[in-house]
A protein has these predicted regions:
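Extracytoplasmic copper-binding redox domains, predominantly the cupredoxin/blue-copper superfamily
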Residues: 61
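Active-site-proximal loop/helix of nucleotide/amide-processing enzymes and allied scaffolds
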Residues: 1-29, 34-36
Length: 163
């Protein structure tokens, strides 16, 4: 299933899957998931997962605070981006390629993030949609940006990351 494949990719190890009702066994190996066009799965392939994976292409490892429930809704106390950006080693900065922008989209909390590309666009993974690159300089996402930050270990020169 898609969920098995995504969890296999998250673990980074080969999975053995057995279906006892038909006595079938198969193994799946982790794939390298492209940053653009990946399907959305909350707690796995979501906006923080994309930010983590993009930073990994630059040699920066981030902690995984993804959860599989809609933490940005008012019934949950979590405020994951607001609570973790500094703790993760990000510092506030002016927008530039490689910076992460944290946005507030249809919520009372900072609930979405993306990376500014070399072309000044936004690499992001919006809830329920495939990850994509969107214009950023003005418009919807720029208007919802709460803060622009850059990881302290991110080099000034961004390594190529598009497949």
């Amino acid at each position: 299933s898609d969920l098995d494949r995504q969890q296999c990719n998250n673990c980074g190890v080969v999975w053995g899957i057995y279906a006892p009702d038909c006595d079938e066994y198969t193994e799946i190996s982790p794939d390298s998931i492209p940053l653009i066009g990946r399907p959305f799965l909350l707690g796995s392939h979501d906006c923080w997962g994309l930010v983590m994976d993009w930073h990994a292409t630059q040699g920066v490892a981030l902690n995984d605070f993804r959860v599989d429930y809609p933490w940005w809704e008012s019934q949950y106390p979590d405020n994951l981006y607001f609570d973790n950006w500094e703790r993760e080693g990000f510092v506030e900065c002016a927008p530039a390629p490689g910076c992460m922008v944290i946005m507030q989209v249809e919520s009372d909390k900072w609930n979405h993030a993306g990376i500014i590309t070399d072309e000044g666009e936004l690499l992001h993974h919006l809830y329920g949609q495939p990850s994509c690159i969107t214009p950023y300089a003005r418009g919807y996402f720029k208007d919802r940006t709460m803060i622009c930050v850059r990881h302290k270990d991110l080099p000034q020169e961004i390594k190529p990351w598009r497949a």
